[in-house]
Amino acid sequence: MGGCVSVSISCDQLTKNVCSCLNRNGDYIHGLEENLTALQRALEQIEQRREDLLRKILSEERRGLQRLSVVQGWVSKVEAIVPRVNELVRMRSVQVQRLCLCGFCSKNLVSSYRYGKRVMKMIEEVEVLRYQGDFAVVAERVDAARVEERPTRPMVAMDPMLESAWNRLMEDEIGILGLHGMGGVGKTTLLSHINNRFSRVGGEFDIVIWIVVSKELQIQRIQDEIWEKLRSDNEKWKQKTEDIKASNIYNVLKHKRFVLLLDDIWSKVDLTEVGVPFPSRENGCKIVFTTRLKEICGRMGVDSDMEVRCLAPDDAWDLFTKKVGEITLGSHPEIPTVARTVAKKCRGLPLALNVIGETMAYKRTVQEWRSAIDVLTSSAAEFSGMEDEILPILKYSYDNLKSEQLKLCFQYCALFPEDHNIEKNDLVDYWIGEGFIDRNKGKAENQGYEIIGILVRSCLLMEENQETVKMHDVVREMALWIASDFGKQKENFIVQAGLQSRNIPEIEKWKVARRVSLMFNNIESIRDAPESPQLITLLLRKNFLGHISSSFFRLMPMLVVLDLSMNRDLRHLPNEISECVSLQYLSLSRTRIRIWPAGLVELRKLLYLNLEYTRMVESICGISGLTSLKVLRLFVSGFPEDPCVLNELQLLENLQTLTITLGLASILEQFLSNQRLASCTRALRIENLNPQSSVISFVATMDSLQELHFADSDIWEIKVKRNETVLPLHIPTTTTFFPNLSQVSLEFCTRLRDLTWLIFAPNLTVLRVISASDLKEVINKEKAEQQNLIPFQELKELRLENVQMLKHIHRGPLPFPCLQKILVNGCSELRKLPLNFTSVPRGDLVIEAHKKWIEILEWEDEATKARFLPTLKAFPENIDADGYEISF
C-alpha cells in the first residue's frame, strides 16, 4: 500500500493563491491581443530610439570620438531582441484564431497560455531596454597616443639640418614641406626626429600620423593606417569602398589639427583620394614627406622643399669615427690618417659612412685599412657590406627610371672619374654618338638635357651649375655594379678613369669589353693591338698620348665612340683608323693634330667630328667625303681659310650643327651669306679681321646660333641683314634674328662704338666685353626705343673690363628680371648702372668692382642705393677681376 502524506494549509491562503494564478494566467489569454499591440508599439519606440542614437553616434565618430561601451552594448541588445519580437508577432494570427468565449478561453489552452506568457515577458524586456536607452553622452574622446615616438639613430652632424627643417615647417605659411635627396642620405632619419619632436611640442597638434608609402602606392593601405591611428576602427571598415573611406577620414580630420608624415614617396599621393584635408593657414595642419625625386615636390604642391644633402667633410668624419670607435683609431698611429682617406671615399653619404665605419670597427692593423682603400678604389662593390646593404638601397632610384634609354644614359655617367665635374654638353654629345637619343637636329640636344634633368631630379646626378653635373662616388659604384651585371661580368665595363695609370689594360681584358674608359690618366703611348671584337666605346681623353700604334685600331670593328681629346702631344692618327668601320663619334679636340689622316674619309658612318681648339691642323680638305656627318665642330681650329673649304662644307648635305672660327673678311662674308651654313651654325668666333673689314653684317637666318665671339678685330659696326637688305635700327620690327643666342663676348675690338644690335638677341644670358677702348655705350637708348624692344630680359651675367671710354650701359634704368652678376673693372668713365629700385627682383645679385669705383658710383635715387649697396663686393686694387695680382 502506498503511504499517505498530509499537508496543512489554511483555506483563505489557498483561495488567494488560486485566484492570483487564475488572474495572471487569464491575462496571458484574455489580454493577448492587447498585449501584442503593446509589444509592437514598444518595439517601434525602441527601434526609433536606436536610429536616433546611431545618428548621434555617427556624428560624434566623425569628429574622432569613440562610442561608449555601454552605448554599444545597448545597441547590440536591441539588434538581438528585434528578431525575437518579430518572431512572436508573425505567430499572432494563428494564436488569436484559437481564442474563444470572447477571448476568455482558448481552443488549445496550453499553447495559448505559453504564447501569452512569452509575449508578456518580451514586453517587460523591451520596456527595460527602452528605459536603459536614455543616454546623455554616447561617445567620448579617446586620448590615443598623440605622437607615437619612433626609434631613431643619433643625429650625428645633422642637427642644423633638423633645425632648418623644423623652423621652416613651423612657419604659418608652410603647410606642405617636401624633403628630397639621394638614397641613404638620411631623409627617413630626419623625418623620424621631426616626428619625435612633436611629442615635446605640447598640445598644439591633436595627432601626428606616420605612414610609410614606399614604391608601390596603395591608397587603401594608406587609408587603413590613418584610420587605425585615429582609433575609430569598427568591424565594417574593411568592407567600405575607397571613396567611403576617404569621406570618413576627411570628416574626422577636418575637426583636428593634424600632422601627416609620409615617408618614401615615389609618385604623387592624391590627398583628396586618401581623404586628407589640405593644410592651410586657417586649419594649421602640416604635411611632411620624403622622396628621392625632386619632381614629386612639384606634383605634391609643396609650399617649400628642402634638399637633404650629404654631410660636409668634417661632419662626415665625426660620424665615421663614432662608428669605428676610438679604440680602433688609436690602435696604430697611422690609422687615423688612412681612416680619413677611407671616410672620404664615402663622400659624406651617411649610409656608406655607417656601413663602412661599422665594417672597419675591429680592423686594427694599418695594413687592413690600406687594403680597404685599395678595394674601395679598384672595385668598391666587393667591399664588405656594399652589395648587401648599400648598393641595393641606391638601386631603387635606378629601378624607378622609366625606360631603358634613361638607364643606359645613367650608366654612361660612370665612365667619368670619381668626383668629376661632367660637362652637360659632353654627356649629350656622347649619348647622341652612342645612339641613345634622337639624332635629329634640335630634338637631340633638348632630349639630352631633359634626360639630365630627370637624372638630377631622381638624385642620381648632382647639378653643380648650369654647365656641369657630378655623380656621387657611391652612386657611381652602383652604376658600375649594375653595368657589370652585378659584378658577374666586370670585363664588359672597364673603367680606369682618373687613376694616373700609365698603361692600357692587359690584352686579355679587351676581348669581351664593350665600353672602356681610360680618361684622365698618364698614358703616353699605345703600342699593343688588343683584339676588341665587341668594343663599342673607347674614351682616352686627357692623357699624354703622343703615339698610337698603327695596328691598334685594326681589330675594333664595332667601335662607335672614340674620344682622343685633350691629348696635347697627339700630332697624328694612323691611317688604320679607317678600319673602325662602325665609328660614329670622333673627338680630336684640344690635340695637336696637324695632318688630316687619309683614313678618316673612309669613315662613312661618322656622324660627329670634333676638331675644336686644334690650332695646328693644316688642312681639312676631303672632309666632304664624310657624307653622314651631322655635327662638325671647328671652333678655334686653325685650318687654312679658302673658298674650297666652304665648298666642302656645303657638300655635307646632312650637316645639322656647325661651330667655326673665321678670320678672313672674304670668307666670312661668303659664309654669312650662305643660308644653309649660317642656319646650322651653333657657335661662331670672328677673329683677327683687318682694318678694311670695318662692318660685319649678319644674315637674319642664324636662328641656331648660341655663342658669338669677337676677338682682336678692328670692326666698328655690326649690322643685321634680312636677306641682302641691311635692316636700319630706326625701322621698327618685331622680328627676332638671334632667338637662341645666349653668349656674346668681345675681346680687343677697339673701334666699336655701341652694341645696340644686341636688342635682336632676346635670350642673351652672358655678355662679356673686354678691352673695347672706343665703346661709349652698350645700348643706344634712342636706337633701341625705335625698335620697341627691351634688351637684356634674360641676362644673367654682365662683365665689363678695360672699357675706358664707356659712359653708359643704357641711359636710364632697365628691368633685369634674371640678372645675377655684374662685374666692372677698368671702366673709369662709367659712373652709373642702369638700375632702379625695381630693376632686379632677384635677391642674389652680386656687383663686383674695385673699391674706388664703388665710392664714386652714382645711383638713380636713395631707394636704389639702399637696395643695391649691400650687393656690392669690392676686390682689392692690386687684384684683377680674375683674382690675379697686378704687378706694377
From Swiss-Prot:
LRR repeats lie at residues 512-533, 534-555, 558-580, 582-604, 605-627. GO terms for biological process: defense response. Residues 139-442 form the NB-ARC domain. ATP binds at G181, M182, G183, G184, V185, G186, K187, T188. Keywords: ATP-binding, Coiled coil, Leucine-rich repeat, Nucleotide-binding, Plant defense, Repeat. Residues 22-66 form a coiled coil. InterPro entries: Apaf_helical, LRR_dom_sf, LRR_R13L4/SHOC2-like, NB-ARC, P-loop_NTPase, Plant_NBS-LRR, WH-like_DNA-bd_sf. One of its GO terms (cellular component) is plasma membrane. Signal peptide: none annotated. The LRR repeats probably act as specificity determinant of pathogen recognition. Probable disease resistance protein. This is Probable disease resistance protein At5g63020. It comes from Arabidopsis thaliana.
